[in-house]
């Protein structure tokens, strides 16, 4: 697990960047695979998601990930009723408290955003296609809407 010193100074958010270590998956997906869309055993992925949820202090049911497709699409959650998992997109922006948002990466970059004034968090999956097509810019725009 890795933490940003800059983000740790904010007491009202928890964050963490995970590597592939210390999970339950075996073989090609060893070890901390959190991709439900992968060919990994579902029981191992669910155990990995439970582990991640505990580490960041949220319920597994409140950990939101996306069906990432290397796009520039940003999913926004402005209220509890908006929150759904496995929507298609490559970034999440949220004003909703007490949920976890997650981006899954292999060789792409994960980017975490935080606006302490407006209490908005976001994360983006930035592969070369998404970066070239504006995933970072689109995520920042959602913070300003």
Question: Model-found features: residue ranges?
Answer:
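Active-site microenvironment for binding and transforming phosphate-containing groups
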Residues: 1-145
